[in-house]
């Protein structure tokens, strides 16, 4: 027989909000989107359980992972989202355009954004227009700041929380939309880089994630999963994969019976 061993991966997907956009630039609008997105439904309908809801930019399996967005927003709640907009004097429905790339992250991306549109519009608080482009022109567009809201994916160069925060914060953010946070770039990141024991930097990165939640410039959606298929006589599959997707073959062994 065959056994399937499942593990969390380090690839993530998230939304980026352009602060220069008339709608996406408003904190209450971003907070309302964060209050409405149903990650469980998203991964169930679109990815059939092969992805996992993500509530921070640092994914599960990486030191410093937290559930900051869930801790702040909890389950999707239309009433709370409506209140956020109302208190900010914003009239619903809010019109926004969401962009995604057609050829970078797989064919399910279009279905994913259709589901995001459905969720937001079902609240009655948003009217979402979807636009897409091939990766080359998509990349040119977000680097010019042309997109109000757009989807990005990320796979780290190395499995460290720094690689899930530093690239997105600062004047040269890889998202093409500068994100200035002096506390993160001048205090938390430099402090964490002095620590060789990466398991000891959780406090700095949890604080960084609290700041990311407060600003809602980035909205994490999901992280991928990894799978190993092996015969039932093979053990160690659960240790053979790490979040960097490096196959650690030495962890595999043939079971013996006595």
Regions found by a protein language model. Give the residues of each.
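Extracytoplasmic/secreted envelope proteins and their assembly/folding machinery
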Residues: 14, 30, 34, 39-43, ...
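Ligand-binding "clamshell"
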Residues: 1-6, 146, 160-175, 231-237
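A bilobed periplasmic-binding-protein/Venus flytrap-type ligand-binding module shared by bacterial periplasmic
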Residues: 7-32, 45, 189, 224
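Extracytoplasmic/peripheral linker and loop segments enriched in polar/acidic and small residues
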Residues: 28, 43-44, 74, 122, ...
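Ligand/substrate-recognition segments at binding pockets and active sites
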Residues: 86-156
